[in-house]
């Protein structure tokens, strides 16, 4: 299934049905009086979180959604039927944003959660409604009220416990494929990963969801490369695992490049708990590894973990550290409502990972 995390949608709720002007016409009843019924209410537009969805791809092929209008009132005091509501299914973690792309309308954090995005118009009154002691035969009725219409943006922010960040080719996808059942595309060229990937990781008696996003390069916040739009998918993570390639020219500069993009991002990513790890240690000499480790230590102000995603060396220690920090890190306010359902509702339908072993 293709991945789509943003879609522009037009929605319109149903108009209310018109009221009816009618009079009783029965044998032996000379002055039957008014009998026009009220119009039905227009259908609502409702957005609902569906279990098992992990993309907004359905909204690439259909962008216009209109609820049916209410039925007009009829004679013999028959009221019109209400229009049927239409329900838009979205994944857990979806946000509804106004057309200006800045105003947040609603944020979904629970499976099954519903939000009425546009209410249908009220039905008009029939002439029976206007009958009074001074007006025994009213000949007026109200038209139905129009429904609401608007353009909105649906934006998906995946809910995971930990997020992988780093430059392109830092080994993030390889690491994810080794510790979970996820099968991201892996190759030796930059930007192999074009869309976020999720995997469920078992670390001893702990289980957590790990998100891999496309690599960041200098100037990503200005649109360079794939930009920083995918950072929204790790905005709700408790912990960031920052992988740095040991074979790069300068590990410290590589680390600072990514940190600069995190700080330039509008969210709170730069304030999140961060675990720094030096990857691909099997591909460098002992002397170069020590030099890169010292550079990274000075840049990050902490001792980095060492690992190799290919051989598995150091991976158990990284997973245990991740699991421990996840248990202690504060949960984002927006992610609290997701609870244990996040892994079920957001993770693509891949096999559950077995406890990792080298």
Curated annotation (Swiss-Prot):
Q: What is its EC number?
A: 3.6.5.-
Q: Where is the protein localized?
A: Cytoplasm
Binding-site residues, Mg(2+): 173, 193
Its biological purpose: An essential GTPase which binds GTP, GDP and possibly (p)ppGpp with moderate affinity, with high nucleotide exchange rates and a fairly low GTP hydrolysis rate. Plays a role in control of the cell cycle, stress response, ribosome biogenesis and in those bacteria that undergo differentiation, in morphogenesis control.
Obg domain sequence ranges: 1-159
Identify the PANTHER family for this entry: DEVELOPMENTALLY REGULATED GTP-BINDING PROTEIN-RELATED, MITOCHONDRIAL RIBOSOME-ASSOCIATED GTPASE 2
This chain is encoded by the gene named: obg
User: Residues that bind GTP, according to the entry?
Assistant: 166-173, 191-195, 212-215, 279-282, 308-310
A molecular function annotated in GO for this UniProt entry is: magnesium ion binding
**CDD domains the record matches:** Obg (cd01898)
Family recorded in the similarity comment:
Belongs to the TRAFAC class OBG-HflX-like GTPase superfamily. OBG GTPase family.
Q: What is this protein called?
A: GTPase Obg
Q: How does it assemble?
A: Monomer.
GO cellular component, as recorded: cytoplasm
Q: Which NCBIfam families match?
A: Obg_CgtA, PRK12297.1, PRK12299.1
**Organism for this UniProt entry:** Nitrobacter hamburgensis (strain DSM 10229 / NCIMB 13809 / X14)
């Amino acid at each position: 299934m293709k991945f789509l995390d943003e879609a522009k949608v037009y929605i319109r709720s149903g108009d209310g049905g018109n009221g009816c002007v009618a009079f009783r016409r029965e044998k032996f009843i000379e002055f039957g009086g008014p009998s026009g019924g009220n119009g039905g209410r227009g259908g609502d537009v409702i957005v609902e979180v569906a279990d098992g969805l992990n993309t907004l791809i359905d909204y690439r092929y259909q962008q216009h959604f209109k609820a049916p209008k209410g039925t007009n009132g009829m004679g013999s005091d028959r009221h019109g039927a209400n229009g049927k509501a239409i329900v838009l299914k979205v994944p857990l973690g979806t946000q509804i944003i106004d057309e200006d792309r800045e105003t947040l309308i609603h944020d979904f954090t629970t499976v099954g959660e519903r939000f009425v995005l546009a209410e249908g118009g009220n039905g008009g009154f029939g002439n029976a409604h206007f009958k009074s002691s001074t007006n025994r035969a009213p000949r007026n009725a109200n038209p139905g009220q129009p429904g609401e219409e608007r353009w909105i943006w649906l934006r998906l922010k995946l809910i995971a416990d930990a997020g992988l960040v780093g430059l392109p080719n830092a080994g993030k996808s390889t690491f994810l494929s080794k510790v979970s059942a996820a099968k991201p595309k892996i190759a030796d060229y930059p930007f192999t990963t074009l869309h976020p990937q999720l995997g469920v990781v078992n670390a001893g008696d702990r289980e957590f969801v790990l998100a891999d996003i496309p690599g960041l390069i200098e100037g990503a916040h200005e649109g360079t490369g794939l930009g920083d739009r995918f950072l929204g998918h790790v905005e709700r993570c408790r912990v960031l695992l920052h992988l740095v390639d040991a074979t790069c020219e300068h590990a410290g500069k590589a680390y600072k490049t990514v940190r600069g993009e995190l700080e330039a991002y509008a969210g709170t990513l730069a304030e999140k708990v961060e675990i720094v790890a030096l990857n691909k240690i099997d591909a460098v000499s002992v002397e170069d590894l020590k030099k890169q480790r010292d550079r990274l230590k000075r840049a990050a102000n902490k001792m980095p973990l060492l690992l190799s995603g290919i051989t598995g060396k150091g991976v158990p220690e990284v997973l245990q550290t991740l699991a421990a920090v996840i248990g202690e890190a504060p949960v984002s306010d927006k992610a609290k409502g997701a609870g244990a359902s996040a892994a079920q509702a957001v993770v693509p339908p891949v096999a559950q990972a077995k406890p990792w072993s080298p």
